[in-house]
């Protein structure tokens, strides 16, 4: 792994659910692992086993039966800085096996995040990890780089937060950004709830991970929700079975599409918000009338929560219903969209024109953490 050029930039996309990390210029992240820190629930009794007081990522996932799992990033905002530091440490030293003090580092964050969040990120990077330079990029702008466009509206939906960001000729239009704190983790929680109605009980943080897996493997978005509900009620054609880790098999039917339907009808989980089709439409309507046509024709989807089968067709149908009747509407859902934020970051950090954008250690020492608002927008 040490074949990397001395100064290759690192790209670290810290999602609420997964950390995607790697080297600028690569076409995919080297390391993808869950953003979790696990701590033992029980007292260690066997001496000399080298038990640790905390586990990060995949190791926490594999030992989840005896751990309490916590996600330090909630709704795109870092809520536990000590755990976040552990995750970054794990990323640099264990996953990428690099010395952060030798590499400029590009981090990502959700749009409309509190300012203090990015200041603290900047401070930790320079003071704890001693990076030579860093930059904080807005997550939703990056998938556009990855799809080779300069104009479009990005719907980025991950585990913690969903947002629409319209971009015209490379400029994000901040007044039209829509943020919805409803994403993959809420869908997992909702699936836990509706599976309980079926008589399957999932309660612990470890069991939530099982439900997440069920969601990722079996859920899909219905083109017509009412029709699909009727089909599910009258036949068992939509039922699928899933084997739990202990060998017990459970069957799920209409839960498969009721779960992601929440994206279009947030009232399912008691949220008073508009669905993702309406936030997309509202975001476009907040933009200048002359550029709307270009946005309608370039709806770019990104993030793990846009990976449901059927979501692009449903989105096409819903936006067509909202938009003027003659409008050409195109939904772009690239197959690699799960990682397109990272891919966009990799492209951005390796552009020659980007090199003067880095915040250097020297600039940080002179201006302090608030420099991040001046240099990263």
From Swiss-Prot:
Its EC number is 3.6.4.-. Actins are highly conserved proteins that are involved in various types of cell motility and are ubiquitously expressed in all eukaryotic cells. The lineage of its organism: Eukaryota, Metazoa, Chordata, Craniata, Vertebrata. This is Actin, alpha skeletal muscle. SMART domains: ACTIN. Belongs to the actin family. It is an enzyme of class 3 (hydrolase). Pfam families: Actin. The keyword Ion transport does not apply. Oxidation of Met-46 and Met-49 by MICALs (MICAL1, MICAL2 or MICAL3) to form methionine sulfoxide promotes actin filament depolymerization. MICAL1 and MICAL2 produce the (R)-S-oxide form. The (R)-S-oxide form is reverted by MSRB1 and MSRB2, which promotes actin repolymerization. The modification Tele-methylhistidine is found at residue 75. It comes from Atractaspis microlepidota microlepidota. The modification N-acetylaspartate is found at residue 3. The modification N6-methyllysine is found at residue 86. Polymerization of globular actin (G-actin) leads to a structural filament (F-actin) in the form of a two-stranded helix. Each actin can bind to 4 others. CDD domains: ASKHA_NBD_actin. It comes from the Eukaryota. The keyword Zinc-finger does not apply. The modification N-acetylcysteine is found at residue 2. The modification Methionine (R)-sulfoxide is found at residues 46, 49. Keywords: Acetylation, ATP-binding, Cytoplasm, Cytoskeleton, Hydrolase, Methylation, Muscle protein, Nucleotide-binding, Oxidation. In vertebrates 3 main groups of actin isoforms, alpha, beta and gamma have been identified. The alpha actins are found in muscle tissues and are a major constituent of the contractile apparatus. The beta and gamma actins coexist in most cell types as components of the cytoskeleton and as mediators of internal cell motility.
């Amino acid at each position: 792994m040490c074949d990397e050029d001395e100064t290759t930039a690192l790209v670290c996309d810290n999602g609420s659910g997964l950390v995607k990390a790697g080297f600028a210029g690569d076409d995919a992240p080297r390391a993808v692992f869950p953003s979790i820190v696990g701590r033992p629930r029980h007292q260690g009794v066997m001496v000399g086993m080298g038990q640790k007081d905390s586990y990060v990522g995949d190791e926490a996932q594999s030992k989840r039966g005896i751990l309490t799992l916590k996600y330090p990033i909630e709704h795109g905002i870092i809520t536990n800085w000590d755990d976040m530091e552990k995750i970054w440490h794990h990323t640099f030293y264990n996953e990428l096996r690099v010395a952060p003090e030798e590499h400029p580092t590009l981090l990502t964050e959700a749009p409309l995040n509190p300012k203090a969040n990015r200041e603290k990120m900047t401070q930790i990077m320079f003071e704890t990890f001693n990076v030579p330079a860093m930059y904080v990029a807005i997550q939703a702008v990056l998938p556009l780089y990855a799809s080779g466009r300069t104009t479009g509206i990005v719907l980025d939906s991950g585990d913690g937060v969903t947002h629409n960001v319209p971009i015209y000729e490379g400029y994000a239009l901040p007044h039209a950004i829509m943020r919805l704190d409803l994403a993959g983790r809420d869908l997992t929680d909702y699936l836990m709830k509706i599976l309980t109605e079926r008589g399957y009980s999932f309660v612990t943080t470890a069991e939530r991970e099982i439900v997440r897996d069920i969601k990722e493997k079996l859920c899909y978005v219905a083109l017509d929700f009412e029709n699909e509900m009727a089909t599910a009620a009258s036949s068992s054609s939509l039922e699928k079975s899933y084997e739990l880790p202990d060998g017990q098999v459970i069957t799920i039917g209409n839960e498969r599409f009721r779960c992601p339907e929440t994206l279009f009808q947030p009232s399912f989980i008691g949220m008073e918000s508009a669905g993702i089709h309406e936030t997309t439409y509202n975001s476009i309507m907040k933009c200048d009338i002359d550029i709307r046509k270009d946005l309608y024709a370039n709806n770019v989807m990104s993030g793990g929560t846009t990976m449901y089968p059927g979501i692009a067709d449903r989105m096409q149908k819903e936006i067509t219903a909202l938009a003027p009747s003659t409008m050409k509407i195109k939904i772009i859902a690239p197959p690699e969209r799960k990682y397109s934020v990272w891919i966009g970051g990799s492209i951005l950090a390796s552009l020659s024109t980007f090199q003067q954008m880095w915040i250097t250690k020297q600039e940080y020492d002179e201006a302090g953490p608030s420099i991040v608002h001046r240099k990263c927008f």
